[in-house]
Amino acid sequence: MAGNLRAYSFQTADGTTRTGAQIDYNGQPAGYADSPEEVITYVDAHDNQTLFDSLTLKLPTATSMSDRVRMNTLSLATTALAQTPSFWHAGADLLRSKSLDKNSFNSGDWFNSLDFTKQDNGFGRGLPPSADNQAMWVYDQPALANPALKPAAADIRAASAAADDLLRLRFSTDLFRLGSANLIEQKVSFPDGGPTATPGVIVMRVDDTVGRDIDRGLDGVLVVLNASDEATTQTVPALAGRTLMLSPVQAKGSDPVVKATTWVKASGTVTVPARTVAVLVEKQSEAHHHAADTSWWQSTSGQSAPWQAASWQSAATVCTPAGSLV
């Protein structure tokens, strides 16, 4: 999410600070880029299983379909909100399935279909061809025969709407597309990193109060990806006393669950529901104000920026839904 940069440094699980180039990935540096545009970030492509099929095999069988949809959204969010160019495999937003086929180049339309009407995702059409899949048939067969693992049209529509919101988030602010290694190294951090990091949770901050002013409407964004099956509470001491609120994209968006996200101003504490990605924004303060452009808010919410109204000055400072003023 920080551009896969070789020189980007962060605190690792053992408490040491390392650069991307110092992280080993199967004998190769995990961070290898000098600039974010050198990397294309994705979670599925034409090779191997689709995202939906991969989650089918990896999530516990008893995982509800609604949670599977949320995990699909979380997976796509790791690329949509990354500093690199983002790539989505065709149909990833529609829960597309190839019935667990890991190499479908010669499997025909039966396994490669893509239904843009959002009625059927293609799961359960039969065992995938043996050439590249037979070793997995022992796992594939019971999964493909399980009706609970096939999404209904309503699930596909929900996944599509959530994916649309991710695209709106990405283009709601240039802070998700800084475009240079220097800006990423200046502005992007992961406050929950290190040995005390919460399993299944990523917290990313993009601080627009340092370096060049990129978004004249914001002082920064805080992204929380909570892949766990419980709500997570994260405190960012550097944001204590600061006013953050849920992005207008999500406040007006398709997902009712994310709207339960809360922010406690006094301590800089955010609580995000289970299996949810939340993006909180901080409006630009007078200290960093340079003829702030509020068009980003209007284009994403359809309303005038709320800090232009008197209600902003009289807003409460207690724990409230993060979609409200705090």
Where are these regions (language model features)?
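Extended, Lys/Arg-enriched charged tracts that mediate electrostatic binding to polyanionic substrates
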Residues: 1-26
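Loop/helix patches that line or flank the sugar-binding groove of alpha-linked glycan CAZymes
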Residues: 19-222, 227-233, 238-242
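Solvent-exposed beta-hairpin/edge-strand motifs
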Residues: 239-253
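C-terminal beta-strand-rich structural cap/linker in extracellular carbohydrate-active enzymes
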Residues: 261-293
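Tryptophan (W) side chains
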Residues: 296-297, 307, 312
